């Protein structure tokens, strides 16, 4: 079953560094590079969602990240995403911090965590339902 991995960092630049490492290793893991997102909690209290779009990416990934950002930042929004997970991620987004988000299907969470272990961080995981992941992976097998 697909899942969403969130790794929280106390510094605002670390999640982007970990995302770059996952992007670099994406072919060997294997991980869809569009399945990586970062939320940065700016020091002024605003939040920013960072994603990268690779050649051949579908609009489904843009939609997915928009939904994830929306439900994490607005706990009252209905979602398949576990409320406790959403509250925990939002609670870890203190000014000057960041969270790496990775949607996985074929890759295990352990593989992702091992790839970015040098950055530390607090990991959380949450299963992703079919409604949330529709159209993300072209191959139904993953």
Regions picked out by a protein language model, each given a short descriptive name:
Residues 1-99, 103-142:
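Positively charged, small/polar-rich N-terminal and surface patches that mediate targeting and assembly
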């Amino acid at each position: 079953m697909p899942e969403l991995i969130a790794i929280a960092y106390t510094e605002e630049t670390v999640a982007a560094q970990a995302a770059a490492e996952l992007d670099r290793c994406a072919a060997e893991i294997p991980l869809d590079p569009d399945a990586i997102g970062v939320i940065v909690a700016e020091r002024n209290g605003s939040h920013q969602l960072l994603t990268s779009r690779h050649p051949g990416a579908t609009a489904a990934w843009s939609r997915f990240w928009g939904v994830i950002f929306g439900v994490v930042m607005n706990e009252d929004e209905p979602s398949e995403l576990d409320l406790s997970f959403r509250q925990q991620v939002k609670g870890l987004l203190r000014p000057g911090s960041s969270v790496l988000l990775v949607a996985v299907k074929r890759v295990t969470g352990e593989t992702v965590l091992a790839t970015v272990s040098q950055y530390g961080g607090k990991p959380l995981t949450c299963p992703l339902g079919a409604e949330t992941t529709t159209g993300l992976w072209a191959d139904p097998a993953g």
